[in-house]
């Protein structure tokens, strides 16, 4: 993991140079929407949490419209452990029974979301938290998980959903009023149930519906890695399919990369997987030309 930069040790001249280099990117993304999937260590380490909050505020101040979709897997696991439940995953998706869904709603829509909103507001931003149930934002349907061992069969993983439709009106209204939306990935179904939706999938769909200029997905690794542990900086759809096929991309990276690729194919101009363990990784990706993480291309 990269060591954090001590900004107090940077000379005024170098700080000015850094800002000058960011200017073309500020112009490029001014007035544009950037969807950020926020998760991993960046949500649990205090230094990284504060750095992320400041990054998001800076983006808003220079005229870029950040929309945050957050995860909270470790926090959910911790809450489940307190009530004696063990988290179970199939193909990177959390098996969610009724009791687990109650915990998910409490943790994501309450504890985690409010922590993010409070931190952004503490540093001078104006963040508003909402779940996919608020304002009819995310219509969900039950996810039918294909059984890899039995083609044509499906595995029931409970109240786990996929995005059926997104109504972006509430997000656009918040953006128009200069707020930063912070979204918990919980949707509502026509059956009246709440659904736990993978945050990567929500971020990808939301980026598409909002016509976002960029989708940034934060993770706990440098990006997509090959089997030897080398960073793959640029991946096409064909290359990604091959990595799925040979098992290089597996587990929790499956929904992340699938969502990133779908967003790229649906017209999101720039899609990147970045290392959230590096301080200011969001700014490095958006406001510099330094190659960072893995770029996902549709062709």
Curated annotation (Swiss-Prot):
The record's GO molecular-function terms, alphabetically, read: acetylglutamate kinase activity; ATP binding
What InterPro entries is this protein classified in? Answer: AceGlu_kinase-like_sf (IPR036393), AcgluKinase_fam (IPR004662), ArgB (IPR037528), Asp/Glu/Uridylate_kinase (IPR001048), NAGK-C (IPR041727)
Record-linked CDD domains: AAK_NAGK-C
Its annotated pathway reads: Amino-acid biosynthesis; L-arginine biosynthesis; N(2)-acetyl-L-ornithine from L-glutamate: step 2/4
- What cellular-component terms does GO give this entry? cytoplasm
Q: List the disulfide bonds.
A: none
UniProt site positions, description: Transition state stabilizer: 37, 256
Binding, substrate: 72-73, 94, 196
| Keywords (A to Z) from UniProt | Amino-acid biosynthesis, Arginine biosynthesis, ATP-binding, Cytoplasm, Kinase, Nucleotide-binding, Transferase
> Which reaction does this chain catalyze?
N-acetyl-L-glutamate + ATP = N-acetyl-L-glutamyl 5-phosphate + ADP
**TM region positions:** none
Could you tell me the Gene Ontology terms of the biological process aspect for this record? Answer: arginine biosynthetic process via ornithine; L-arginine biosynthetic process
Is this entry keyworded ATP-binding?
yes
Where primarily located? cytoplasm
Location comes to:
Cytoplasm
UniProt-listed Pfam families: AA_kinase
Q: What is its EC number?
A: 2.7.2.8
Q: What does this protein do?
A: Catalyzes the ATP-dependent phosphorylation of N-acetyl-L-glutamate.
Family of this protein: Belongs to the acetylglutamate kinase family. ArgB subfamily.
Q: What is this protein called?
A: Acetylglutamate kinase
């Amino acid at each position: 993991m990269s060591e954090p930069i001590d900004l107090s040790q940077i000379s005024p001249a170098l700080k000015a140079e850094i800002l000058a280099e960011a200017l073309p990117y500020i112009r490029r993304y001014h007035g544009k929407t950037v969807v950020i999937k926020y998760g991993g260590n960046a949500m649990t380490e205090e230094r990284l949490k504060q750095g992320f909050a400041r990054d998001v505020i800076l983006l808003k101040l220079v005229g870029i419209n950040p929309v945050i979709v957050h995860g909270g897997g470790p926090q959910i696991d911790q809450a489940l452990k307190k009530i004696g439940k063990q988290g179970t995953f199939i193909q990177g998706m959390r098996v969610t029974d009724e009791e687990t869904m109650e915990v998910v709603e409490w943790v994501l829509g309450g504890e985690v979301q409010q922590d993010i909103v409070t931190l952004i507001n503490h540093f001078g931003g104006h963040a508003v938290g909402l779940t996919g149930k608020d304002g009819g934002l995310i219509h969900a349907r039950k996810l039918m998980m294909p059984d890899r061992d039995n083609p044509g069969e499906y595995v029931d993983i409970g109240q786990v959903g996929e995005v059926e439709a997104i109504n972006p009106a509430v997000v656009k209204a918040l953006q128009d009023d200069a707020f930063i939306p912070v979204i918990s990935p919980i949707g509502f179904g026509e059956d009246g149930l709440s659904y736990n939706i993978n945050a990567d999938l929500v971020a990808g769909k939301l980026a598409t519906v909002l016509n976002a200029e960029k989708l940034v997905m934060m993770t706990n690794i440098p990006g997509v890695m090959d089997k030897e542990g080398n960073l793959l900086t640029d991946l096409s759809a064909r290359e990604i399919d091959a990595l799925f096929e040979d098992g290089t991309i597996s587990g929790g990276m499956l929904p992340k990369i699938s969502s990133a690729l779908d967003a790229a194919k649906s017209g999101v101009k720039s899609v990147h997987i970045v290392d959230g363990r590096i301080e200011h990784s969001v700014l490095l990706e958006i406001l510099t030309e330094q190659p960072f993480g893995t770029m996902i291309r549709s062709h």
